[in-house]
Curated annotation (Swiss-Prot):
GO terms for molecular function: phosphoribosylanthranilate isomerase activity. It catalyses: N-(5-phospho-beta-D-ribosyl)anthranilate = 1-(2-carboxyphenylamino)-1-deoxy-D-ribulose 5-phosphate. The gene is trpF. Keywords: Amino-acid biosynthesis, Aromatic amino acid biosynthesis, Isomerase, Tryptophan biosynthesis. It comes from Lachnoclostridium phytofermentans (strain ATCC 700394 / DSM 18823 / ISDg) (Clostridium phytofermentans). It is an enzyme of class 5 (isomerase). GO terms for biological process: L-tryptophan biosynthetic process. This is N-(5'-phosphoribosyl)anthranilate isomerase. Its EC number is 5.3.1.24. Belongs to the TrpF family.
């Protein structure tokens, strides 16, 4: 299972992830709390270990801006966390070769089934929030995923269930080890669960990554 630490903002946080080596980090270009600009992202990317891939997180962003950051190699993957639909994703794919992660802020089985046919490379399942596009650190109800993969295994959605997915939403070192063993996520995504006072906490990052790796071994 891959690991992703999202919402990096400083060189100190880059030092932490370089030390413990998650597979991915996320640079957020939307919202307020963890938003950074392209100049900061470029600086952080230069200091990031070449073994770690940078994901740009966008909400209803212009395709031109995303393409420009991909071209500069500031990011290697694109995460769409807004209302981007099939037409948007297809148009983006014409402009960038980077893999695309589509966030699904799911409240129900039906919402996930509706999203499954989108032409992205990965899904990221996050908690629905009425007030923001992020999950705000609230735990994702993974029983929805279990239901999807049980109910859809023998119907027209079966072929889409092979697409890799991340689980996000309120994960911590304490609860990531409790993920349903019937699920087979490609990766887990964490942000607030490894923070103290709004900054990435080295001890929490280490604990989370080790807990995720141990779950992967079970």
């Amino acid at each position: 299972m891959k690991t992703k630490i999202c919402g990096l903002k400083s060189l100190r946080e880059i030092e932490i992830v370089n030390k413990y080596a998650p597979n991915y980090v996320g640079f957020v270009f939307a919202g307020v709390k963890r938003k950074i600009d392209e100049e900061v992202a470029s600086l952080l990317r230069r200091e990031l270990s070449s073994e770690i891939q940078a994901v740009g997180v966008f909400v209803n962003e212009s395709i031109e801006r995303i393409a420009k950051m991909c071209e500069k190699n500031t990011i290697q993957l694109v995460q769409l966390h807004g209302d981007e639909d099939r037409d948007y994703i297809n148009a983006l794919k014409l402009e960038v070769g980077a893999p695309i992660i589509k966030a699904v802020r799911a409240q129900s089985v039906e919402q996930i089934l509706e999203a499954l046919t989108l032409p992205c490379d990965y899904f990221l399942y996050d908690t629905y929030s009425e007030h923001s596009y992020g999950g705000e650190g609230k735990r994702f109800d993974e029983t929805i995923l279990t239901e999807v993969y049980k109910e859809s295994s023998n119907n027209e959605f079966k072929k889409y269930l092979q697409k890799p997915y991340f689980i996000a939403g309120g994960l911590t070192a304490q609860n990531v080890r409790l993920l349903d063993s019937r699920l087979e996520p490609y990766g887990v995504d964490v942000s607030s669960g490894v923070e103290s006072m709004g900054q990435k906490d080295e001890e929490k990052v280490k604990e989370f990554l080790f807990a995720a790796w141990r779950w992967n071994e079970n």
